[in-house]
UniProtKB/Swiss-Prot annotation:
Annotated PANTHER family: BAG FAMILY MOLECULAR CHAPERONE REGULATOR 2, BCL2-ASSOCIATED ATHANOGENE
InterPro entries according to UniProt: BAG_chaperone_regulator, BAG_dom_sf, BAG_domain, Ubiquitin-like_dom, Ubiquitin-like_domsf
Protein name: BAG family molecular chaperone regulator 2
Lineage summary: Eukaryota, Viridiplantae, Streptophyta, Embryophyta, Tracheophyta
Gene3D superfamilies listed in its UniProt record: BAG domain, Phosphatidylinositol 3-kinase Catalytic Subunit, Chain A, domain 1
PTM-bearing positions, type Phosphoserine: S244
Taxonomic source organism: Arabidopsis thaliana
Chain ranges of the BAG domain: 132-210
Length: 285
């Protein structure tokens, strides 16, 4: 076990030592290093008595953690009184004179409770600020991509609409306002400063781009197609003159042959002459 002496207390309770877990406790002497044994102590909390079984060489801090589960009070908000004296969490029970059936009193420490709540609030504020800075960093990365795209267009001789540049500037300034509302110390303060420097750099770069963009020549508008060029194929074909339209018009007439009614009736009234066969037929009886 690693031990480190850090001085002697003024109360005469002996020197302190550092345990492997990082807890500084009362240093044990050779004559007090007897075999540990279990004891039962009675702890009064308000009007309720709790009987706790614990090792005699445990600390008051370990006793507080056991009492926390039984009473619901946070162990950092407790004060244990033994023989009309408050006992420190780092002190051992046996070295303080605690024996089997000893009586102790547990009270809540309002000052310790307030300190703990303030510390918890500080931790929560730090986490909230860190998350807010992370969100701003994500948005700044996205806006930096737009800035890079505009820089590429203007660098190649193109021109960006002034409205797009103004919108990007407004979004960058909004992120600066959000960042200014975040407060914090340590890592939060360092991260905030880094994002502020980054945003200021992008704002300056955008100002230069706006000046450069204003000097770019105006892009020629696309030519408007004439109405004749927008006609469909069939409309165009209907408007083109055909080869036959250039020649004089052809007049088609019909000559009707008239027949006299008398001649027609005569032709119909003429008898039909029989046709004699050219072959000679032999008749047999």
């Amino acid at each position: 076990m690693m031990k480190m002496s850090i001085g002697t207390t003024t109360s005469g309770d002996g020197e302190m030592e550092l345990r492997p877990g990082g807890m500084v406790v009362q240093k044990r002497t050779d004559h007090s290093s007897s075999v540990p044994r279990g004891i039962r102590v009675r702890v009064k909390y308000g009007s309720v008595h709790h009987e706790i079984s614990i090792n005699s060489q445990s600390t008051f801090g370990e006793l507080k953690k056991i009492l926390s589960g039984a009473t619901g009070v946070h162990h950092q908000d407790m004060q244990i009184i033994y023989k009309d004296k408050e006992r420190d969490s780092k002190m051992f029970l046996d070295l303080s004179g605690v024996k089997d059936r000893s009586k102790l009193i547990l009270i809540e420490d309002p000052i310790s409770q307030e300190k703990r709540l303030l510390e918890l609030r500080k931790i929560a504020t730090k986490e909230k600020s860190s998350k807010a800075i992370s969100d701003i960093s994500f948005q700044v990365e996205r806006l930096a991509g737009q800035l890079s795209a505009f820089d590429t267009v203007i660098g190649k001789g193109g021109k960006v609409e002034e409205k797009n540049l103004e919108n990007l500037m407004e979004m960058l300034m909004n992120q600066l306002v959000k960042l200014d509302a975040i407060s914090g110390d340590g890592d939060v303060k360092l991260k905030k400063k880094m994002q502020e420097e980054r945003l200021h750099k992008y704002v300056e770069a955008l100002d230069l781009l706006k000046i450069k963009n204003s000097r770019q020549p105006q892009t020629k508008p696309k030519p408007q197609y004439k109405e004749r060029e927008m006609l469909t194929f069939y409309e165009e074909a209907s408007r083109k003159p055909t080869a036959s339209s250039s020649s004089p018009p052809v007049i088609i007439t019909t000559r009707w042959e008239t027949f006299d009614s008398s001649s027609a009736s005569t032709a119909t009234l003429q008898p039909v002459r029989p046709v004699h066969p050219k072959f000679k037929w032999e008749l047999f009886n």
